[in-house]
């Protein structure tokens, strides 16, 4: 009696499903293409021809990120078509703050069992994010890992590469005392603080994924799955006409941890807490979770997705331009002299 043969599919990896998935996402990938893209997806590497004639001394800027436990909300709601926007946003927003135009993007998707339909829904979001950012999706990796992830769960990571002329790199070194801090509004929680938000909403408040959040006209799923705002086009527009001395992407660590990343020695940020109105979700989370104010500002973006440091004389014109770009923006503070031993960011 001969032993029965075993296949890769028997072990939980379906190559045919993978091939079906690739065919399904090709139009989504094509929709993001730029003239510099040389080859279609499916090769061993993505090819992108940098037009160096556009730059005096081009510097490539790279970033990688994920979306954290916001994925848990997507699993509970069984909604997967916007989480890819978050993935792109977290990466391209990190490189635009250095003045770099995002050029191309790659994604990594790992799951226990590949569902081509669900996978295509995820990549639909990645494609939309790339279109918003103006960068090309030139490749990715889909890993089917049976026994590694539970049930229908998956994880994602993204990788973005951009370019900036060396003399136009924004690193905060030109920030000076008197610069104004302009905050650009976020679209919600973006992709940070979800472990705390989930604990409060599900454990403390006892809500379900489809329940209306008290005080809001939105369900938990609608509020928490609001896509992260992509600021690339607006900031590139500003950089063409205004001197921007520093930009901070307000992600994990909130205002208190991210603004210091761009401050030169001898400078501190004075942030006026009453200069903008955070969306109601933050007050709801603070009250329900009994969160101290300092913890709130170092966990969530509190309604501010980007902070720009600009010369005082340019602040009003920058606000006008941002309004014309459909961004809600506010002067939220200024740069002051930092005395030895004092905090880099003061919330006043």
From Swiss-Prot:
Record's Gene Ontology CC terms?
cytosol
Enumerate the catalysed reactions: 2-formamido-N(1)-(5-O-phospho-beta-D-ribosyl)acetamidine + ATP = 5-amino-1-(5-phospho-beta-D-ribosyl)imidazole + ADP + phosphate + H(+)
Kindly list the biological process annotations in GO that this record carries. 'de novo' IMP biosynthetic process; adenine biosynthetic process
List the keywords (alphabetical): ATP-binding, Cytoplasm, Ligase, Nucleotide-binding, Purine biosynthesis
Q: Which GO terms describe its molecular function?
A: ATP binding; phosphoribosylamine-glycine ligase activity; phosphoribosylformylglycinamidine cyclo-ligase activity
- Primary site of residence: cytoplasm
Q: Where in the cell is it found?
A: Cytoplasm
Checking SUPFAM superfamilies in the record gives: PurM C-terminal domain-like, PurM N-terminal domain-like
Q: Does the keyword Cell cycle apply?
A: no
Which EC number applies?
Answer: 6.3.3.1
Family matches, as HAMAP family: AIRS
Q: Which family does it belong to?
A: Belongs to the AIR synthase family.
UniProt-recorded name of the protein:
Phosphoribosylformylglycinamidine cyclo-ligase
């Amino acid at each position: 009696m001969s032993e029965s043969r075993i296949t890769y599919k028997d072990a939980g990896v379906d190559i045919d499903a993978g091939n079906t998935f690739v065919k399904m996402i090709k139009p989504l990938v094509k929709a993001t293409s730029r003239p510099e893209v040389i080859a279609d997806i499916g090769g061993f590497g993505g090819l992108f021809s940098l037009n160096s004639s556009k730059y005096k001394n081009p510097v490539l800027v790279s970033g990688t990120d994920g979306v954290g436990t916001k994925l848990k909300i997507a699993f509970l709601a069984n909604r997967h078509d916007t989480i890819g926007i978050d993935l792109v946003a977290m990466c391209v927003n990190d490189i635009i703050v250095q003045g770099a135009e995002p050029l191309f993007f790659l994604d990594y998707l790992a799951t226990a069992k590949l569902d081509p339909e669900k996978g295509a829904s995820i990549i639909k979001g990645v494609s939309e994010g790339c279109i918003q950012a103006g960068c090309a999706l030139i490749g990715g990796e889909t890993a089917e890992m049976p026994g590694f992830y539970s049930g229908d769960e998956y994880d994602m990571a993204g990788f973005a590469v951009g370019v900036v002329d060396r003399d136009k790199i924004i690193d905060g070194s030109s920030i000076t005392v008197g610069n104004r801090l302009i905050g650009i509004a976020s679209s919600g929680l973006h992709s940070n603080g979800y472990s705390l938000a989930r604990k409060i909403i599900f454990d403390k408040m006892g809500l379900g994924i489809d329940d209306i959040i008290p005080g809001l006209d939105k369900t938990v799923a609608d509020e928490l799955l609001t896509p992260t705002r992509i600021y690339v086009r607006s900031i590139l527009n500003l950089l063409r006409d205004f001197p921007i001395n520093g930009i901070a992407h307000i992600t994990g660590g909130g205002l208190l941890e991210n603004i210091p990343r761009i401050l030169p020695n001898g400078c501190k940020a004075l942030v006026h807490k009453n200069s903008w109105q955070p969306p109601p979700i933050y007050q709801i989370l603070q009250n329900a979770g009994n969160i101290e104010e300092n913890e709130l500002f170092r966990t969530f973006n509190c309604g501010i997705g980007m902070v720009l440091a600009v010369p005082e004389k340019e602040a009003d014109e920058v606000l006008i331009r941002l309004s014309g770009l459909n961004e809600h923006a506010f002067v939220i503070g200024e740069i002051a002299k930092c005395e030895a031993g004092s905090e880099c960011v003061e919330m006043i």
